[in-house]
Amino acid sequence: MANYQNLLVVIDPSQDDQPALRRAVYIVQRNGGRIKAFLPIYDLSYEMTTLLSPEEGSTMRKGVTSQRTAWLKQQAYYYLEAGIDIEIKVVWHNRPYEAIIQEVITGNHDLLLKMTHKHDKLGSLIFTPLDWQLLRKCPCPVWMVKDQIWPDQGSVVVAVNLSNEESYHHELNLKLVKETQELANQVMKNPEIHLVSAYPVAPLNIAIELPDFNPSVYNHALRGQHLIAMKELRQTFCIDEKYTHIHEGLPESVIPQMCDEMNAGIIVLGILGRTGLSAAFLGNTAEHVIDHLKCDILTIKPDGFECPIKAAKE
């Protein structure tokens, strides 16, 4: 159940405004729960000097950590004064993504929120290597927050994969829609939830290579397959047909366009979290889509996902 009660917010040390913290407060005010504002810091210069003893180096690191803790408390000051339950935590760690995921695990956090930046000219979001590490490896849902206010009457879009290739797609679709409905009903008033899916058409040159192949018949059959699967999915969750959308084309083109047309405030995506060679050679549809989006993004892993990062040793 998407009853997020234990939120971890990754703080951006380069910003005086923290949209991810603001979004977390928005959720907690409507749904209850608590927030941990988390900042991993590291400066290689404190590790490389030969002029300091280990004790002096440790003292300097503690000093930097204390300064950042004070700064972070100032960032959260008005929320704390308003009675919002926010824990402040700053840690020294040379791999930020590991520190964040380890904190998720040890703190039993059920939602991770992090700010992302918008490309000045393209409008799409810019994802850093840290963002991608979290999206692929974090065991709990990850909410990437854009640095903009929530659009008026913004809708919620769920991207679903309706192919019959793998059974886990159906299971993940059910999880995405179920958790989206639960979260939206908890934090929004009269949420408008749309289900969106895309299917690729047959290549134009395939008729040349296979003279007996009829692309139009194939495309029609493929669309019919998706319509049947979408009907089954929407009826499972009592979603009206007008809130379901199936379009031909590549997901990375269709889904961002649909989000723009529907003034989406957030899109919910399933992400398999592939790493290593499988990511390099097979790719990941969700990751291709993410690169073209302009709204908030909530990514959810399938049941049974195994996090490659282990909890920090005490």
From Swiss-Prot:
Role noted for this protein: Required for resistance to DNA-damaging agents.
Subcellular location: Cytoplasm
InterPro entries named among the record's database cross-references: UspA (IPR006016)
NCBIfam families cross-referenced by the UniProt entry: PRK11175.1
Chief location: cytoplasm
Sequence similarity: Belongs to the universal stress protein A family.
Gene3D superfamilies linked: 3.40.50.12370
Protein name: Universal stress protein E
Cellular-component GO terms for this entry: cytoplasm
Pfam families (UniProt xref): Usp (PF00582)
Keywords: Cytoplasm
